[in-house]
Structure formats: structure tokens, C-alpha cells
């Protein structure tokens, strides 16, 4: 099915669109963090074909004591806000898909394929600022093509009104650019996200969800427009957290709980994430694949937070909920 109202995007337009998304997000992160915390840029080549990528990585100071200092809040504007983060753009061309992928998608051996997109993860220092993940991508092999992408939020000390605002922003993007027939509605994307970012061995979701779409292959022009706008929406989605929550003071208990909760993030990425599995199986670039992991995390044996604590409150958020219809009188 193709659109009769809009021109079908070319491979070059899609590639350049993703590159623009990377640039805009990086500008936002630099500006919002005060301009002093710069990323390191790594331009790399795809050695098993052609193309490559640009990885932009933030790695904060390793001065744990400083970030727990009582003067942290007064010095906040001079402090690094991103402990570990990265915004990656890639565009690769190859002809040797993993056999499992080639079989699943009925792609003949040695078929040329292209894969391009932007992937990002931000792990902040402050436990009051949630981790965020976003991915927007395009794949093509012969006559087969599809778009995919999504965004999800992983707070440690969530505030209900902020979670509702996050989902409201996502719904606005879907209402304006998504379509039910293209499977890009908010309801479908949210349900898929709740299902995908679930840790079965823990019985909980990774965070408070968001949107997740994969194998979108109906109406290329409209689907590309949706994916493009979803990528740019990152700024509106994350700005309230990065601007408003970074100045909230925190103590060692909160920092320790943040590190403990990060272990769940690592478990999901290494055990269940499709992108990680595909990257490893296809002998992709290891540094880019594992960029999403936090700099520091902890595991504690059989740990359970005490009842009626802010730490225990998080667990009430780690299940699928109809965020847009939450009772605002019960704000946390």
C-alpha cells in the first residue's frame, strides 16, 4: 500500500532525516545541561559492508562522593547531569543477514540490505530524573521494508503527574501523525510497549512504558512522517524531567536505590532486548550495541524495599496502567 497524497521518501531522505534527529537531540541535551557537559564523538565505519555511524557519548565524572555532597544542590548548575548517555546514528549496507533473520522475513541469501536509525539512552546522576530510551529505525532488503521505533521511561522516584504528562505528549504525537490503519495509534503502541518492556523473571515492567512499534510496512510516506516526528518529540518528552527534576536534592539512600534499580535495566537489555540480540548475532559494532548500559549498577540478594517508603512506591508503577485516565486526586 502506498500513499497517493505524499511523495514516497527516498533512502537518502530517510538517512538524512535520522541524522537531523540526532543533531537536534544532541543540541537540546547540551543546552539543557548547561552547555558545559559535552559529548565525545566517535565516527565509525561498517567493516562488513559499507556505511557506518556517528556515536555521541556522554560520560560524567566518576566522583561519587561529590554527587552525594550536601552542597550538590547549590552547585547543581555546574555539575554533570548525565552520568552515562549516548545518541547514536547509523547507516549500514550489507548483504549477509543472520540466517535466522533471513528465514523469518523470507529474504533470499546475499540480498542487499540497509539499516539506518537513531538510538539513544540517557542515564542521569540524579535519581529524581528518570532514565529514557528511544529508538527510531528503518530496514530494507530487496522488496521488504519496514519502520520501527519507540520510547520508554524508567523512573526511580516517579511522580504521577509527570508520568501522565509524558503519556499525554506521546498521545498527541500519535493523534497528529499516527493512523489506526498503519498501526501507529497511541493505544496500539502503548500496549506493545507494556508487553515488550516486561521482565518475566521479575514480574514487573522495566518502567512506566511509552510506545513501541515494529515492522510498520503500510503507507511508507505517512509512516516515515510519524517515525520522524516521534524522534523529534524526544525534546518535549524529556525536557520537563531534565529541567525540573535535576535540581531536586537526593541522599545516599536514594542513590543506592537508583543503582539497584539499574540492575533491572541491565537484565532486560542483556536477556530480552531484540536489538541487542540482533546486533550480537549479526556481529554488529559491540561498543554501539552495549552503549545503552549504565556506568554503575548494583545487585542485592533478595532485596525488598520497606513498606510505605518512596522506594516501595515505585513498585506500584511497574505494571501496565491506563495513565491517561488516572485519578489526578491520587497524585504521588
Curated annotation (Swiss-Prot):
Coproporphyrinogen III binds at residues 119, 135-137, 284-285. The active site is at residue 133. GO terms for biological process: protoporphyrinogen IX biosynthetic process. Its EC number is 1.3.3.3. It catalyses: coproporphyrinogen III + O2 + 2 H(+) = protoporphyrinogen IX + 2 CO2 + 2 H2O. GO terms for molecular function: coproporphyrinogen oxidase activity. The keyword Oxidoreductase applies. Signal peptide: none annotated. GO terms for cellular component: cytoplasm. It holds the Pfam family Coprogen_oxidas. Disulfide bonds: none annotated. Keywords: Heme biosynthesis, Oxidoreductase, Porphyrin biosynthesis. Pathway: Porphyrin-containing compound metabolism; protoporphyrin-IX biosynthesis; protoporphyrinogen-IX from coproporphyrinogen-III (O2 route): step 1/1. PANTHER family: COPROPORPHYRINOGEN III OXIDASE, MITOCHONDRIAL, OXYGEN-DEPENDENT COPROPORPHYRINOGEN-III OXIDASE, MITOCHONDRIAL. Homodimer. Involved in the heme biosynthesis. Catalyzes the aerobic oxidative decarboxylation of propionate groups of rings A and B of coproporphyrinogen-III to yield the vinyl groups in protoporphyrinogen-IX. Belongs to the aerobic coproporphyrinogen-III oxidase family. This is Oxygen-dependent coproporphyrinogen-III oxidase. It comes from Dictyostelium discoideum (Social amoeba). The gene is cpox.
Amino acid at each position: 500500500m502506498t500513499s497517493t497524497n505524499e511523495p514516497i521518501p527516498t533512502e537518502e531522505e530517510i538517512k538524512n532525516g535520522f541524522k537531523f534527529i540526532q543533531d537536534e537531540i544532541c543540541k537540546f541535551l547540551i543546552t539543557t545541561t548547561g552547555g558545559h557537559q559535552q559529548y565525545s564523538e566517535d565516527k565509525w565505519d561498517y567493516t562488513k559492508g559499507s556505511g557506518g555511524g556517528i556515536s555521541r557519548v556522554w560520560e560524567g565524572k566518576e566522583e561519587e562522593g561529590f554527587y552525594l555532597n550536601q552542597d550538590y544542590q547549590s552547585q547543581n548548575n555546574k555539575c554533570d547531569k548525565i552520568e552515562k548517555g549516548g545518541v547514536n546514528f547509523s547507516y549500514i549496507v550489507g548483504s549477509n543477514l543472520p540466517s535466522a533473520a533471513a528465514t523469518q522475513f523470507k529474504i533470499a541469501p546475499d540480498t542487499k540490505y540497509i539499516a539506518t536509525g537513531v538510538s539513544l539512552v540517557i542515564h542521569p546522576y540524579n535519581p529524581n530524573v528518570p532514565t529514557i530510551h528511544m529508538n527510531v529505525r528503518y530496514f530494507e532488503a530487496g522488496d521488504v521494508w519496514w519502520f520501527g521505533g519507540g520510547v520508554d521511561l524508567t523512573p526511580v522516584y516517579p511522580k504521577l503527574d509527570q508520568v501522565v504528562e509524558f503519556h499525554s505528549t506521546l498521545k498527541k504525537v500519535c493523534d497528529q501523525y499516527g493512523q489506526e490503519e498503519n498501526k501507529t495509534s497511541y493505544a496500539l503502541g502503548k500496549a506493545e510497549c507494556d508487553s515488550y518492556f516486561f521482565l518475566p523473571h521479575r514480574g514487573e515492567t522495566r518502567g512506566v512504558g511509552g510506545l513501541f512499534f515494529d515492522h510498520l510496512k503500510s503507507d511508507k510516506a505517512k509512516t516515515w512522517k510519524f517515525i520522524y516526528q516521534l524522534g523529534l518529540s524526544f525534546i518535549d518528552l524529556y525536557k520537563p524531567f531534565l529541567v525540573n527534576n535535576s535540581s531536586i536534592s537526593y541522599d545516599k539512600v536514594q542513590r543506592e536505590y537508583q543503582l539497584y534499580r539499574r540492575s533491572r535495566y541491565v537484565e532486560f537489555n542483556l536477556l530480552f532486548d531484540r536489538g541487542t540480540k540482533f546486533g550480537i548475532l549479526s556481529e554488529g559494532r559491540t561498543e554501539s550495541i552495549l552503549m545503552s548500559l549504565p556506568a554503575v549498577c548494583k545487585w542485592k540478594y533478595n532485596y525488598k524495599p520497606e513498606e510505605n517508603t518512596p522506594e516501595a512506591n515505585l513498585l506500584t508503577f511497574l505494571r501496565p496502567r491506563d495513565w491517561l485516565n488516572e485519578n489526578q486526586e491520587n497524585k504521588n
